[in-house]
Structure formats: structure tokens, C-alpha cells
From Swiss-Prot:
GO CC field: cytoplasm
UniProt record similarity statement: Belongs to the UPP synthase family.
EC number: 2.5.1.-
PANTHER family cross-referenced by the UniProt entry: DEHYDRODOLICHYL DIPHOSPHATE SYNTHASE 7-RELATED, DEHYDRODOLICHYL DIPHOSPHATE SYNTHASE FAMILY MEMBER
Protein name as it appears in the record: Dehydrodolichyl diphosphate synthase 8
Pathway(s) the chain acts in: Protein modification; protein glycosylation
InterPro entries on file: UPP_synth-like, UPP_synth-like_CS, UPP_synth-like_sf
Keyword terms, alphabetized: Transferase
Molecular-function annotations in GO: transferase activity, transferring alkyl or aryl (other than methyl) groups
Length: 272
């Protein structure tokens, strides 16, 4: 019995080593072409995944989704993508049943606090976490946890991850316009008109470059009120794969599509 376990363990180690080598080769080939500066993910399909797999519990699909987050971030880091934006919880999601909302938010808090422990132990592998959205609408414990995690990881630079929580473009624009007006009034420049740059500087996501590739899982064609201002020149890639099903090859295919469309995307940028 012990020999069997040892053999399984050795096989697992060999398999993982081979997979790591394969990824390194694939990513080296990918890096011959342009790599997106910021990939944004609209993580759709957790509930459908749970239903498809007959998983029990309101948070079952979302727990599976968190596993995908871990792997996708690792792949992006290995490829050399400097920024990743995750649409974790939109303002419209608060319209779901109160029991489900509480379940998802509790799970998210659990993962944030677990990541805090990792950051304290120095196990973040150079990943910086930034939370963006109407964080004031969240409970005090959640806000405190997000603030602490951002502080603990603010010096990390290998991969910068923006997690959009309590987020919608509509709310973001209202917030940005209001803050822009307040800034101008405080500087005594309230008489001048607002410039586009004034508003963009006050956006929740202004700390990172705008996305140049948006990946939506679950077969949807909509942006669902996610960064519609910032993604006007981005490539939208949709996949039928549900978020917990998203894997290495889905990501590689999305980046290859981005590379094939590069001439078109550059022409669009020059028009703005």
C-alpha cells in the first residue's frame, strides 16, 4: 500500500514537471508576439457550473471559480502579463437573493482573509492586489480586510491584480465626475470645464492601464456594465467555457486571437 502511494506521488511529481515544461515552451512561443498589458476577465458561469456538475451548496460553483482564479493568475504571471482585472462582484449582483449574496460575500471575505495570511507569510510571489469599486457600500469587516491586503502587497510588482467588487461603470462614472468637481473646487479651479483627463484620473481603475483584451466566459456577448468606458478600444473575446472550466488552452487561444487582431486594434487606437 505504501509503495503504491509512493508511486502515485512520484508520478504526480513527474507529471507536474512535464506540464510546467510544456507551459514554459508554449509561453515562450506566445511571447514572440505582442502580449496584452491588461487582460480583464468577466467571470461568468459559476452557478451554471454548479448546476451542470450537480454540486450542492449556494457557494459550490463560486468555490470552483476561485480555483480557476488561482490558475489563471499563475498562467498570466508566467506569460508576462503585467496587469489582470477581475470582475468579481457587480452592483447588479446585489439584486440576487439575499441568502446567495451573503453566501458569496462571505466566501469572498474568507478568501481575502486567507490571502492576507499568505501575504503576512511572504507567500504572494510578487502579486499585488488592488480592490476597485464602491467599497463604502460593503460592511466594515470586508473593507478593513481589503485595505489590509492592499497595504501588505503594495510593493509587489510581478503581477498587479485589480479585483472589481461592488462595481459598475455607471457608478464609477458618477463617482469620477463628482470627485473631479470636488477637486476643482478645492483647487480654486471650479470655473473651468471638466476635461476628459479629469474624469479618468478619478475612476476606480485609474491606477492601472486600460484593458486591451477582455475575456468573457459563459458564452455571453455583453460587457455587463463592466469597464465600458475603459474598454472602447479593447478586443472582446468570448468563450463558451464556464468560468470554473477556463483553463490554459482557453487563455492561450484568447492571446493568439489578440495577436492576430493586433494590426486592426492599433489602427483603432490611432483614430482616438
Amino acid at each position: 500500500m505504501n509503495n503504491t502511494r509512493e508511486e502515485v506521488g512520484e508520478f504526480t511529481q513527474i507529471f507536474n514537471a512535464l506540464m510546467s515544461l510544456m507551459r514554459k515552451f508554449i509561453f515562450k512561443v506566445l511571447r514572440v508576439g505582442p502580449i496584452p498589458t491588461n487582460i480583464s476577465f468577466i467571470m461568468d458561469g459559476n452557478r451554471r457550473f454548479a448546476k451542470k456538475r450537480n454540486l450542492e451548496g449556494l457557494d459550490a460553483g463560486h468555490r470552483a471559480g476561485f480555483i480557476s482564479v488561482k490558475y489563471i493568475l499563475q498562467y498570466c504571471k508566467e506569460i508576462g502579463v503585467p496587469y489582470v482585472t477581475l470582475y468579481a462582484f457587480g452592483m447588479d449582483n446585489f439584486k440576487r437573493g439575499p441568502e446567495e449574496v451573503k453566501c458569496v460575500m462571505d466566501l469572498m471575505l474568507e478568501k481575502v482573509e486567507l490571502t492576507i495570511d499568505q501575504a503576512v507569510s511572504g507567500n504572494m510571489n510578487g502579486v499585488r492586489i488592488i480592490f476597485a469599486g464602491d467599497l463604502n457600500s460593503l460592511n466594515e469587516r470586508f473593507r478593513a480586510a481589503t485595505k489590509k491586503l492592499m497595504e501588505l502587497t503594495e510593493e509587489n510588482r510581478d503581477l498587479i491584480v485589480v479585483v472589481c467588487v461592488a462595481y459598475s461603470t455607471s457608478v464609477e462614472i458618477v463617482h469620477a465626475v463628482r470627485d473631479s468637481c470636488v477637486r476643482k473646487s478645492k483647487t480654486g479651479d471650479g470655473s473651468s470645464a471638466l476635461e476628459l483627463s479629469d474624469i479618468e484620473e478619478c475612476m476606480y481603475t485609474s491606477v492601472v492601464p486600460v484593458p486591451d483584451l477582455v475575456v468573457r466566459t459563459g458564452g455571453g456577448d455583453r460587457l455587463s456594465n463592466f469597464m465600458t468606458w475603459q474598454t472602447s478600444r479593447a478586443l472582446l473575446h468570448r468563450t463558451e467555457a464556464l468560468w470554473p472550466e477556463l483553463g490554459l488552452w482557453h487563455l492561450v487561444w484568447a492571446i493568439l486571437k489578440f495577436q492576430r487582431m493586433q494590426d486592426y486594434l492599433q489602427k483603432k487606437k490611432k483614430l482616438h
